[in-house]
């Protein structure tokens, strides 16, 4: 973070553009006892989510004439670099929309307000512990969590049944069950599973808690990597399903999750692992005769846990109106609003009450009940607080995992490359 600042200081042209876009952190209209105006930089990029956000903000503005919120529509592309520039230039918005995996460095550098005292006991109890942990840095709550995703197995029910496999039901299923299902369904030129793993690191790290995997110990630049049985279990399983069982359509391992939906739609694979939000795309884009289901959350030896990386709302510590901004966050994340936002984005609400409300409304719709239930198992993970994680993910882990899945290196070499790469990152 510190080394980035020297480079950022030279970016005066970009800084001036951002200053024009975001103003000076809530000054507008606040002089002489007039109404306070808070800037809210929203990264929502789906039309339905943008509309839901604007509706929530509109309701707040109508009810709070003395504290008005102005939405500044941004986007996820280069969001991290934009925020670095804004914070260093003093032009960051009052309210910052981002994600748990990215806010740690900003909190560590003192850019985010401590919201602990504004978070009511009722709301604190409504947020699952693992999710709240993901937005807690040095014992300070630095964001309100809003939306989550999990990884879900979507299945072509007809293909599974035709293969002689029994479609799993119940609260959870096991990875051994998934492997056997894929083997059983691999026949007659069709594969049991398609899994878009062109960028496998985020998936493997997020799903490691089910195997007891942590990957990292410590925080910030002091975080140390750990690559043992719990971390290697899922990559090894995927490798074996591909190289030994031949139950994964090989090309999907080189594709994104979205691209891997095409063979699922075409009936080439019986199952596909996807981000839970893809349920909306499957419902919209799949052939009408595709009878698809969302299978129960997958449990490993340590249960069905997955790492939570919620979208977040934080308050700029330098805002002149931290208290008013925190009150807006409390309103934005109430049960009704969170349920509406997550329905629009096809995501999982970060509070129990909003998740229950959405399940009550949409639980009968295909896939929703299972997806929402998976939210119960989302937990915190150390990678969220490892300072060099993003660089390690892109420059070390992803190419190493790709080589391993392509059978170019063995498991021991993979583990060594992951560990050695962590030590070399940032040097």
Where in the sequence are the language-model features?
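A structural signal for short loop-to-beta-strand junctions that line the ligand-binding cleft
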Residues: 93-94, 123-159, 181, 192, ...
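Glycine-centered hinge/linker elements that transmit conformational signals in sensory
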Residues: 182-184, 222-252
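Hinge/lid segment of periplasmic solute-binding proteins
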Residues: 100-151, 177, 207, 291-295, ...
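Mature extracytoplasmic/periplasmic domains
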Residues: 277-280, 311-391
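Conserved N-terminal structural module of periplasmic/extracytoplasmic solute-binding proteins
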Residues: 2-105, 124, 167, 301-302, ...
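Extracytoplasmic/periplasmic substrate-recognition and gating elements
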Residues: 62, 163, 240-246, 284-347, ...
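C-terminal capping/gating helix-and-loop segments adjacent to ligand/active sites or protein-protein/ligand interfaces
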Residues: 369-422
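Extracytoplasmic/periplasmic solute-binding protein
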Residues: 138, 142-146, 151, 176-224, ...
């Amino acid at each position: 973070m510190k080394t980035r600042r020297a480079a950022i200081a030279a970016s005066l042209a970009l800084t001036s553009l951002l200053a024009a876009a975001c103003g000076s952190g809530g000054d507008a209209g606040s002089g002489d006892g007039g109404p306070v105006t808070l800037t809210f930089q929203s990264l929502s990029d789906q039309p339905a989510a943008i509309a839901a956000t604007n509706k929530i903000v509109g309701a707040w503005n109508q009810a709070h004439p003395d504290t008005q919120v102005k939405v500044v529509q941004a986007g996820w592309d280069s969001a991290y670099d934009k925020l670095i520039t804004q914070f260093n230039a003093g032009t960051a918005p009052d309210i910052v929309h981002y994600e748990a995996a990215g806010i740690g460095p900003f909190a560590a550098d003192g850019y985010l307000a401590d919201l602990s005292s504004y978070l009511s006991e009722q709301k604190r109890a409504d947020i699952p512990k693992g999710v709240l942990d993901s937005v807690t840095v040095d014992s300070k709550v630095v964001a309100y969590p809003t939306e989550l995703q999990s990884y879900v197995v979507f299945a072509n029910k007809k293909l599974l049944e035709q293969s002689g496999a029994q479609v799993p039901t119940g609260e959870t299923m096991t990875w051994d069950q998934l492997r056997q299902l894929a083997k059983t369904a691999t026949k007659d030129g069709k594969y049991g599973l398609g899994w878009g793993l062109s960028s496998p690191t985020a998936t493997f790290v997020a799903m490691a808690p089910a195997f007891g995997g942590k990957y990292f110990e410590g925080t910030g630049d002091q975080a140390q990597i750990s690559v043992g049985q719990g971390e290697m279990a899922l990559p090894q399983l995927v490798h074996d399903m591909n190289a030994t069982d031949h139950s994964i359509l090989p090309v999907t391992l080189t594709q994104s999750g979205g691209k891997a939906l095409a063979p699922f739609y075409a009936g080439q694979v019986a199952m596909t692992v996807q981000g839970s939000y893809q349920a909306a795309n499957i419902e919209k884009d799949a052939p009408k005769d595709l009878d698809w289901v969302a299978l129960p959350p997958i449990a490993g030896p340590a249960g069905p846990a997955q790492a939570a990386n919620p979208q977040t709302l934080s308050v700029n510590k330098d805002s002149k109106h931290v208290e008013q901004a925190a009150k807006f966050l409390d309103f934005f994340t109430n049960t009704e609003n969170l349920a509406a936002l997550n329905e629009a984005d096809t995501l999982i609400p970060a509070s129990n009450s909003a998740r229950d409300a959405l399940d009550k409304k949409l639980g009968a719709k295909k896939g929703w009940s299972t997806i929402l239930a998976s939210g119960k198992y989302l937990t915190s993970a150390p990678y969220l607080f490892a300072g060099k994680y993003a660089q390690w993910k892109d420059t070390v882990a992803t190419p190493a995992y790709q080589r391993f899945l392509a059978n170019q290196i063995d498991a021991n070499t993979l583990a060594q490359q992951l560990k050695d790469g962590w030590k070399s990152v940032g040097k």
